[in-house]
Amino acid sequence: MLFDVFQQYPAAMPVLATVGGLIIGSFLNVVIWRYPIMLRQQMAEFHGEMPSVQSKISLALPRSHCPHCQQTIRIRDNIPLLSWLMLKGRCRDCQAKISKRYPLVELLTALAFLLASLVWPESGWALAVMILSAWLIAASVIDLDHQWLPDVFTQGVLWTGLIAAWAQQSPLTLQDAVTGVLVGFIAFYSLRWIAGIVLRKEALGMGDVLLFAALGSWVGPLSLPNVALIASCCGLIYAVITKRGTTTLPFGPCLSLGGIATIYLQALF
């Protein structure tokens, strides 16, 4: 029935996808900020350090607030993208600057959802790619902040890809998706092991290995070299622009871009 509506009103799906992307992007900002804190609290509890009830946070509580003045953000000031523009990037109460990251994450998510709806109209694969985009955006920003890819995001990428293949919404068969995961894991784990011996230091984090393997469920074994090539080029460009030299490079965003780019290249060519 829903697809019948989209057929009758072809502009409806891109509009809904864009609005949905803005809303999901707003939620991703919460996840990006709070999830690492939640894990640190869990680790503290594991070691016997009990945080106070007031300081303990979840994805739902406490309500979003300004990190500078601690004032709870009003509903009218929490509209994705629009509120940041209307407030000119400042807190209504203390006038402290609001990071540009918040509208950028919301805008990027909206654009990712819009693009998927345009490339795969009236398709379950479009929804799957939207979900993938959300996983990758959150994982990439956390990796940029903390140089760490949480397992929950790489597992989300993995299971979403496998479920899409199982439900026959993916261009891949379930067998190809599983093979892609196995080949991706073996290839990148071997590369990690060899690079560790040659360089005598960890060249790839285990999170990078797991993310590459998870992307195999989306692109299949034959397209994994494309993911690695695009990711390597992105990593090189990022290192040159930021002048990081031999310092640790967060590779998750590069792999994410390589995976998404490969999925769209498969669709277009």
UniProtKB/Swiss-Prot annotation:
UniProt keyword Transferase, yes or no: yes
Catalytic activity: Typically cleaves a -Gly-|-Phe- bond to release an N-terminal, basic peptide of 5-8 residues from type IV prepilin, and then N-methylates the new N-terminal amino group, the methyl donor being S-adenosyl-L-methionine
GO terms (BP aspect): methylation; signal peptide processing
Disulfide bonds: none
Name of one Pfam family that matches: Peptidase_A24
Transmembrane residue ranges: 13-33, 102-122, 124-144, 147-167, 178-198, 210-230, 249-269
Alphabetical keyword list: Cell inner membrane, Cell membrane, Hydrolase, Membrane, Methyltransferase, Multifunctional enzyme, Protease, Transferase, Transmembrane, Transmembrane helix
Annotated localization: Cell inner membrane
Single GO cellular component term: plasma membrane
Alphabetized GO MF terms: aspartic-type endopeptidase activity; methyltransferase activity
E.C. designation(s): 2.1.1.-, 3.4.23.43
Membrane topology reported for the UniProt record: Multi-pass membrane protein
Reported phenotype of the disruption mutant: No effect on assembly of T2SS-beta, severely reduced secretion of the labile toxin exported by T2SS-beta.
Miscellaneous: Encoded in a type II secretion system (T2SS-beta); this strain encodes 2 T2SS but only this one (beta) is expressed under standard laboratory conditions.
Family: Belongs to the peptidase A24 family.
Its biological purpose: Cleaves type-4 fimbrial leader sequence and methylates the N-terminal (generally Phe) residue.
Name recorded for this polypeptide: Type 4 prepilin-like proteins leader peptide-processing enzyme
Organism from which the protein derives: Escherichia coli O78:H11 (strain H10407 / ETEC)
Lineage: Bacteria, Pseudomonadati, Pseudomonadota, Gammaproteobacteria, Enterobacterales
Gene name of the encoded protein: pppA
